[in-house]
A protein has these predicted regions:
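N-terminal secretory signal peptides and thylakoid transit peptides that target proteins
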Residues: 3-25
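A short, well-structured edge-of-sheet supersecondary motif
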Residues: 35-59, 281
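Active-site SXXK
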Residues: 44, 52, 63-88, 118, ...
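Active-site-proximal helix/loop microenvironment
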Residues: 55-70, 112, 152-213
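Conserved active-site-proximal loop/helix segments of enzymes involved in bacterial cell-wall
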Residues: 89-119, 187-245, 307
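Active-site-adjacent helix/loop patches that line small-molecule binding or acyl-intermediate pockets
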Residues: 90-96, 107-170, 176-177, 181-184
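Short, Gly/Ser/Thr-enriched beta-strand-loop segments that form substrate-interacting elements
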Residues: 241-275
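Short, well-ordered beta-strand elements
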Residues: 267-269, 277-288
Length: 308
């Protein structure tokens, strides 16, 4: 469903394919209202992982929307921490799978993939299959652990639903119209992975962080390691492989694409350098897919900035 790709040679075919995927369950219609209210602009936020200070070179308009495959980070954490799948267990992706009557597609058949490669290549078949026994309550519990229902500084949370007795895969793939995290929450998600759960209070330069509690989340070293490896591999060979040519900044990231009316919105969130994380970032684009817009625009911001 939300299987991202950064290939550009088949952009027209990819767009048609995405439309066919995202048409399931009326998701296109469900996102029409947001499309009409969307600005079509690109937003970019970054944060210092030592001080918690947030920079916003595109302005402080905090968009929220369907997160797409970024939610696979949350799902991977739940799957690994709850032992719903073992770290090295593989699932054979043949390009599609049917879950409770819904056909879920990947852009390509990924073959046998484990958790790390499923994150890197955004394999929807892997996550939909591995999450068949995951309840919405469990997924939301982990989404809450990542702060997707809580404010970031003075900015309120985006839309967060109550669990129902239904399948979790629309949330796992970031395609439910009832879950709309905002850009700062997705920024914090990457900061959490980068710092293995210990993140300073995120704030603007005008806001004091004195006395503010740090964000803390405890997972096993195994889980943190798989999440970090997956995001690193996404930039080296996966859905964000055009983000950091030559591995100059040592970026780790996760892409996400979702419907916005009859078009697409996309996200890219990550951190760098992955061997000693100092910065996290999030880019949101309301006018295209991750391969067409989010990755190239994030690359521009990352390489145009003089990082201390």
């Amino acid at each position: 469903m939300s299987s991202d790709s950064s290939g550009s040679g088949n952009s027209i075919g990819r767009r048609d394919f995405l439309k066919s995927m995202f048409g399931l369950g009326g998701l296109l219609e469900a996102s029409e209202a947001q499309a009409k209210s969307g600005t079509g602009r690109t937003i970019f936020f970054w944060s210092d992982l030592k001080t918690g200070q947030v920079g916003f070179p595109t302005g402080f308009m905090v968009e929220a929307g369907l997160p797409g495959s970024v939610m696979k980070i949350v799902a991977a954490a739940a799957l690994l921490e709850e032992s719903l799948i073992s770290p090295n267990e593989t699932i054979d992706c043949k390009g599609h799978v049917t879950i409770k009557g819904a056909r879920i597609n990947c852009l390509v058949a990924h073959g046998k993939v484990d958790a790390v490669h499923a994150i890197a290549h955004s394999c929807s078949v892997y996550f939909a299959t591995a999450s068949k026994t995951m309840s919405q309550s469990l997924f939301f519990d982990y989404a809450q652990k990542f702060g997707l229902n809580s404010a970031v500084g003075s900015v309120k949370s985006g839309l967060f639903p109550k669990p129902e007795k239904s399948t979790a895969w629309p949330y796992v793939l970031g395609l439910s119209p009832h879950l709309h995290p905002n850009a700062l929450q997705l920024l914090r998600l990457s900061a959490i992975v980068a710092n293995r759960g210990d993140v300073p209070y995120l704030h603007s330069a005008e806001e004091s962080a004195q006395g503010k509690a740090r964000f803390n989340l405890e997972f096993s070293d195994m889980t943190w390691g798989r999440l970090q490896q997956g995001m690193q591999l996404a930039v080296r060979e996966g859905t964000a492989h055009k983000l950091d040519p030559g591995n100059k900044l040592h970026v780790a990231a996760k892409t996400g694409t979702a419907p916005l009316g009859k078009k697409f919105q996309s996200w890219l969130t990550g951190y760098f350098p992955y061997d000693a994380p100092r910065y996290a970032f999030c880019l949101g684009a309301l006018n295209g897919t991750s391969s067409e817009v989010a990755v190239p625009r994030a690359k521009e911001f990352l390489f145009a900035t003089e990082w201390p």
